[in-house]
Amino acid sequence: MTCKMSQLERNIETIINTFHQYSVKLGHPDTLNQGEFKELVRKDLQNFLKKENKNEKVIEHIMEDLDTNADKQLSFEEFIMLMARLTWASHEKMHEGDEGPGHHHKPGLGEGTP
């Protein structure tokens, strides 16, 4: 009998599968080179990184910041730090200006006005 995955578990699988969708294109199949990373950011993070996508140098800087071992590639471990940062930033945006009792959510990153 197969257990049905929760939404969170499916979302984790989606992150892994998306990473591999790009990482297998060139070079080592389990790392993202600069071109693969740029393509992933442009296609799959176009709303979360709207401003950053307009400037190629900014995307390069993001990769350099994530590339902790300076090998010009991103391992999954390095890439997942971007996912963690974006998740945190989106959560913070949802609570921006949220004061007082209760728990309210506004649109996060990639939501709201274009």
Swiss-Prot record:
GO cellular component: calprotectin complex; collagen-containing extracellular matrix; cytoplasm; cytoskeleton; cytosol; extracellular exosome; extracellular region; extracellular space
Membrane disposition: Peripheral membrane protein
InterPro entries, alphabetized: EF-hand-dom_pair, EF_Hand_1_Ca_BS, EF_hand_dom, S100/CaBP7/8-like_CS, S100_Ca-bd_sub
Subcellular location: Secreted; Cytoplasm; Cytoplasm, Cytoskeleton; Cell membrane
Pros-methylhistidine carried by residues: H105
Impact after mutating M83A: Loss of antifungal activity
Disulfide bridge partners, by residue number: none
PTM annotation (S-nitrosocysteine): residues: C3
Assembly mode: Homodimer. Preferentially exists as a heterodimer or heterotetramer with S100A8 known as calprotectin (S100A8/A9). S100A9 interacts with ATP2A2. S100A9 interacts with AGER, and with the heterodimeric complex formed by TLR4 and LY96 in the presence of calcium and/or zinc ions. S100A9 binds quinoline-3-carboxamides in the presence of calcium and/or zinc ions. S100A9 interacts with amyloid-beta protein 40. Calprotectin (S100A8/9) interacts with CEACAM3 and tubulin filaments in a calcium-dependent manner.
Tissues with expression: Calprotectin (S100A8/9) is predominantly expressed in myeloid cells. Except for inflammatory conditions, the expression is restricted to a specific stage of myeloid differentiation since both proteins are expressed in circulating neutrophils and monocytes but are absent in normal tissue macrophages and lymphocytes. Under chronic inflammatory conditions, such as psoriasis and malignant disorders, also expressed in the epidermis.
Species this chain originates from: Homo sapiens
Biased composition regions of type Basic and acidic residues, renumbered to the chain: 93-102
Residues the record lists as binding Ca(2+) 2: D67, N69, D71, Q73, E78
Function in brief: S100A9 is a calcium- and zinc-binding protein which plays a prominent role in the regulation of inflammatory processes and immune response. It can induce neutrophil chemotaxis, adhesion, can increase the bactericidal activity of neutrophils by promoting phagocytosis via activation of SYK, PI3K/AKT, and ERK1/2 and can induce degranulation of neutrophils by a MAPK-dependent mechanism. Predominantly found as calprotectin (S100A8/A9) which has a wide plethora of intra- and extracellular functions.
UniProt keyword list: Antimicrobial, Antioxidant, Apoptosis, Autophagy, Calcium, Cell membrane, Chemotaxis, Cytoplasm, Cytoskeleton, Immunity, Inflammatory response, Innate immunity, Membrane, Metal-binding, Methylation, Phosphoprotein, Repeat, S-nitrosylation, Secreted, Zinc
Lineage, opening ranks: Eukaryota, Metazoa, Chordata, Craniata, Vertebrata
Designated name of the protein: Protein S100-A9
PROSITE patterns: EF_HAND_1, EF_HAND_2, S100_CABP
Region: Disordered, residue numbers: 93-114
Domain named EF-hand: residues: 12-47, 54-89
